[in-house]
Structure formats: structure tokens, C-alpha cells
Amino acid sequence: MSITDILSAEDIAAALQECQDPDTFEPQKFFQTSGLSKMSASQVKDIFRFIDNDQSGYLDGDELKYFLQKFQSDARELTESETKSLMDAADNDGDGKIGADEFQEMVHS
């Protein structure tokens, strides 16, 4: 499976363009521009599984750092502050990782 099986390459490119400079990544804006926020819960969880490198069922800080690169391989890494903000936005139970349900809730919030 490729991420472009779910999201259009054009929408992904537009979303990445909006946050190409360090410290400009805004999760909700990215989810809207990429089309992710319009996807069903099932489709969002498919994207989650694609981002979950080690297939642990959770996204940790290292996986979040490379979040944008899962959408396009030559995208930049998230900065430390962007990674922390993304974690804080989704980690509802405070366990230091993001589960599939937490990710889906963040995308659709």
C-alpha cells in the first residue's frame, strides 16, 4: 500500500509546501490541505499503520520526527518543537506515544 492510494499526490504536495520551512508545521492545517481530515476513520487508521514504522500500534517521538517523510520521501524532518507539539496534541492519555484511536481523534478534531 502507498499513501497515495488514499490521498492524492497533489494534495500531499500542497500540504508539504505549506510547511516546508522549519517550525511552520501545523497539524490541523496539514490534515486539511492533504485531505486527511476528510477521510473516514478506517482510512485514517490505514494512514496511521503506514506511519507506524515498527508496527507497534503506537507512534513515538522518533516516528513523529519523520512524519512528513512518510508522505513524501524528500520532505524535511519535523523540528524538536514540532515533534513535541504533535505529540502533545494527540497523546490524550499522557503515555508518551500516540495510538491509532488518538491519531484518528486528532485528525478529525
Curated annotation (Swiss-Prot):
InterPro entries hit by this protein: EF-hand-dom_pair, EF_Hand_1_Ca_BS, EF_hand_dom, Parvalbumin
Binding site for Ca(2+) 2: D91, D93, D95, K97, E102
UniProt xrefs under Gene3D superfamilies: EF-hand
Cellular-component GO terms for this entry: cuticular plate; cytoplasm; extracellular space; protein-containing complex; stereocilium; supramolecular fiber; vesicle
GO biological process: cochlea development; response to wounding
Domain EF-hand: 39-74, 78-109
Keyword annotations of the record: Acetylation, Calcium, Metal-binding, Repeat
PROSITE patterns per the UniProt record, alphabetical: EF_HAND_1, EF_HAND_2
The keyword Ribonucleoprotein is annotated on this UniProt entry: no
UniProt xrefs under CDD domains: EFh_parvalbumin_beta
Tissue: Found in tumor tissues and not detected in normal tissues.
GO molecular function, one term: calcium ion binding
Binding site for Ca(2+) 1: D52, D54, S56, Y58, E63
Origin: domain of life: Eukaryota
N-acetylserine PTM positions: S2
Function in brief: Has some calmodulin-like activity with respect to enzyme activation and growth regulation. Binds two calcium ions.
Family designation: Belongs to the parvalbumin family.
Entries under PANTHER family matching the protein: ONCOMODULIN-2-RELATED, PARVALBUMIN ALPHA
Name listed for the protein in its UniProt record: Oncomodulin
Organism field: Rattus norvegicus
